[in-house]
């Protein structure tokens, strides 16, 4: 009731809210939730991968069962269940343009604490599972304080019209400068399925945010959420960079409303807006 009252106070439509009481380990739905594909007849396919707490760094015994609970015991999701639990995969570790290209990082998907497979084996699995034509691998790029082994949703994201937005560090004294500069060069070398370079739009590096023990946190503007008519993006009480990020996203998503969401509380848990959400296409609810 307290959740419903809080949401109602913000003017949201309570009739569109579905609640289920399920045990969880953490808050990061992006990494354990179903990944959805659509069949040619628009039937949703709900792909259920194994989640192991980002390489067994944290407990995941409850989170790893949430999909099962939502589909079989709290039947609020519709579509065809697809068993993929023989492969460890987090939603934040992959980025698809919906046209046959997928962007990911070697540091995460080739980590020995995920799957005991080499790069070609992982790529073949991804292509078959997601009906892909190419997988674009990033070897460089990281954020201090990141527990995920460099999830791509913190570094670089696909946008409409063969555009990629990515985190760029301009401060040569910042610890991220070299790695993000090398990532930028990799992005410049990538090609679309038509053989053309991607249109690249740099997002500002968020000003450093620290926890109580003065450890740097992985604040990033790449962790935005795409919706039908809007893009929600994280802000960090940093007016100049928050506004610059909004300008870049407005250029990348013409016609969509760009809405900032204060993520100063979320980032203290080492994640942000995209990490804590998972979108589903029409027909799943």
Could you tell me what each predicted segment is?
Residues 1-285:
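The feature marks the mature, well-folded catalytic cores of soluble enzymes
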């Amino acid at each position: 009731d307290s959740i419903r009252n809080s949401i109602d106070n913000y003017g949201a439509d309570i009739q569109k809210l579905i609640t289920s009481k399920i045990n969880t380990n953490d808050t990061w739905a992006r990494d354990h939730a179903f990944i959805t594909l659509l069949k040619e007849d628009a039937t949703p396919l709900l792909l259920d991968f194994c989640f192991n707490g980002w390489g067994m760094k944290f407990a995941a015994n409850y989170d790893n069962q949430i999909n099962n609970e939502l589909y079989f015991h709290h039947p609020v999701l519709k579509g065809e269940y697809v068993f993929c639990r023989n492969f460890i995969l987090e939603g934040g570790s992959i980025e698809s343009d919906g046209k046959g290209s997928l962007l990911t990082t070697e540091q995460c998907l080739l980590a020995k604490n995920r799957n005991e497979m080499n790069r070609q084996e992982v790529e073949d699995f991804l292509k078959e599972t997601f009906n892909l034509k190419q997988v674009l691998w990033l070897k460089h790029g990281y954020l201090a304080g990141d527990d995920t082994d460099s999830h791509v949703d913190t570094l670089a994201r696909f946008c409409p019209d063969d555009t990629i937005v990515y985190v760029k560090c301009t401060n040569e004294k910042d610890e991220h400068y070299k790695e993000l500069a090398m990532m930028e060069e990799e992005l410049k070398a990538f090609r679309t399925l038509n053989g053309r370079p991607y249109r690249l739009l740099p997002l500002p590096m968020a000003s450093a945010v620290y926890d109580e023990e003065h450890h740097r946190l992985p604040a990033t503007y790449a962790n935005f959420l795409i919706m039908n008519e809007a893009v929600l993006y994280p802000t960090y009480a940093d007016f100049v960079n928050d506004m610059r990020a909004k300008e870049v996203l407005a250029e990348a998503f013409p016609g969509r409303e760009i809405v900032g969401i204060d993520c100063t509380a979320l980032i203290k848990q080492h994640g942000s807006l995209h990490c804590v959400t998972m979108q589903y296409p029409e027909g799943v609810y």
